[in-house]
């Protein structure tokens, strides 16, 4: 790029998504639109950006992620639809393929999804240039070239291809739909999934994963999607558990449980896990998001040069999903999967200029991210033998995911700024390496508890049948007197031991069955099912027993609609439009803006969901909000403060939060909803279809939680009512305050009635308890309540002692204050007296001074004389000594000044004492309120203790009756066993005789079998000897055949024809012989041939007889039941010998013919 075009880059928009510079002319655009395939070396490896840029003479860009010339496509999306040019088989990038004309569309080769290897899905998201970067003069160094390419502005030859590249204007909803939705859907089907964001600090990782009010992140969208899938899946039951942890300075902390610090990583057959991590069962999106918000409160954050609120730790939000078929005739398969949503801390360079603790945190963050990069490099290398998972806690926890067990989606967040060009390049290299990791996603299935129960039931039935068969067999055998008393006793002991063992095994199986049934019943209430399966049953009026816990559309309505994120014109629907201008903080104050950002960041995931609810106190004025929150009761919990965000403000900083609160009609038409009210309404709605496996204790626990929530809301409304009453006393003519007071009173009465209804339901549940197991649980609950009662009593005693001490201190201060008031009054009287005396003395002095003035003729001379007296005291002392009256006046004036100072000091002390007494009065009133509340709670606990003691007495009576019944049944069982023992001894004797007979028969059978086996072994040895002889004779015959060949090679003289045994011989024509051969010579040759034929015939007959013998032996062996002999081997030997003899005879005939 020429230097003349660089000055124009200062005006580049931060939302720029592709290079549009005209300096390069048409060649640059063509290169960007049609990048050529990658250049490969001789070994077929893809070229790096540096090598490709140095090798390309014309500056043609290459793709680093491309493979060899005839190999795989450049992008993972091309694994499913690969584009090839007609001239060569080289793959092209999706940008080049999309830019081709429609008429020249290349052929598409479909790849079977079952056989294709699946890789990690890697996406890149650009954030826009920040105002700080724009003010600093940064330029766009990296940009998105199409939907799958990232290019460098200064070196177009450096380009990377990924599954998807998101520009700066892309919404988080769009990122979730492409990068994370398939992972969430797979997790709901039993496939483990992991989604994590990677990038440098201040690149937008936390914004992508958590989001804000206007644009929710991946985690809240995934939570919404999970519950939406459950709602759309009426055929399955789901159980959801969540855990939330952070890795801070290589230490694992539990964010849901602040006590869980420095946890350890363990490993079992299923993979790695964190020991002692807290898991919460969630029932709704609100519940899950509230847990995330509470976990964010404990996460470590800090500030650096790039970000005011920077994440200083890695966080892992794990959602464990269990699902099973909801039908009764299911196969018992349970799918178990984990969805890990990870927000990594950003890598830091020296540009952050951190010191002290921040530098230490950055070193740990860089170390873990470096280990993650090393592990990914080792995984993609293919030659590495050791992968350093244990070098970092992060890679240790990600070992199962990086090993390929589940789906992984990597979202790399990058900044296009030129000042971070090197960091962005490193992030792209990391993403490029991660793309080559292969994964094998498969469903995780476990055996359901119901199937285990069926298995145990079948096994118990089989054991009982075996026991019955054993007893029937012992009863069926005849009686034979025992031959030996010792054998009888030993057999009896063995049978008793076997019976005891069998009985204990049956008891263990029954206990295991009962434990599993109890676990199933306790977990039934935590199972989530869709409400779509119960529509028809609700219409017909029949209660569905399969419905555990369901959530409706009102729960999902709190979350923003998916379609809202696709359009940028729906800002009027967003929550920011509901905030008034007065509620915004002053951006000029950096401290308040920092606190505002931090508060918004922590509540960002719940703010957009909670603010959808209309506030029950939206009609309150600004002064009421500020006063009620500034002096709220300290007994309110943090959860109650989170439920009412309008009451969380201090000093009136936030005014009216919604525009709906300004209109009283809207306030009346949309009454406020609270969490406790929702729970109460849900409990009242579900009263007719309680779950079949829910125990009384679980119901009581749920009702107690609802009562606690309602009590907190009642306390909050009472505090607001108190503030409004004070305002009404000051402004009795304000009708709006009176209406609000009436509303609050009605709401308090309604909540109290709800509390009474819940307490009545708890009492009814306790009265209808008849199950012994539930009674045992009630006794345990009673012991816990008694312990809590003792603790509360102790705390109350401590509070009363503190109250007495405070009252004593208050009385002492009041007495001191009274003494000080008396002292002040006395001092005032003394001051008045002194002032009166001083006035009198002044009058006397004036009278004395009037006498010399009358003697003087001129007043001016008298004034000059007085002035001279005042200027020259020595002169006055010489003329006249100072009178004692004037000295007294001066002393009294000094004393008056001291008294004035003492008066001011005493006034200040009085004000301080009044303030202190006021504080003590407030503390005393607060202590009285606490004492009253404690007295009420103590009264309730006493009533509950009396009720539980009554129940305990009932249980003790039932237990005594059960013990008496058990004792009587044991006595009857002992008598019956004594009667059965006599019969059992006779049965044992019979069984002993029958076992002796069976042993004798078995010994005879074994001896006969041993003899037969010995005989068979002898026969086999004989057969082997025969086989050896046959082999020797066969060798002799081959020698004979060789001799015959030598004799017949000289001349073909004779031909023989054998009429017996199928042999033929004839004399050959003697026309070719010499005319001088005599007949005697012919006779001699004829004799030799006849003798050779006779020998061959004899040998053949011998071999034929032996073959018949072997056939007879084989047939006899086949007729016998001999499992130890190999009949096939004997038949193969027989066939071999027959073939050998036939070949010998054929050779003989052929030689004779020749």
UniProtKB/Swiss-Prot annotation:
GO biological process: microtubule-based movement
Keyword Chloroplast carried by entry: yes
Gene Ontology MF: a single term: ATP hydrolysis activity
Pfam family for this entry, one: Kinesin
Coarse class of the protein's main subcellular location: plastid
Coiled-coil ranges from the UniProt annotation: 441-523, 734-761, 801-845, 894-967
Protein name: Kinesin-like protein KIN-7E, chloroplastic
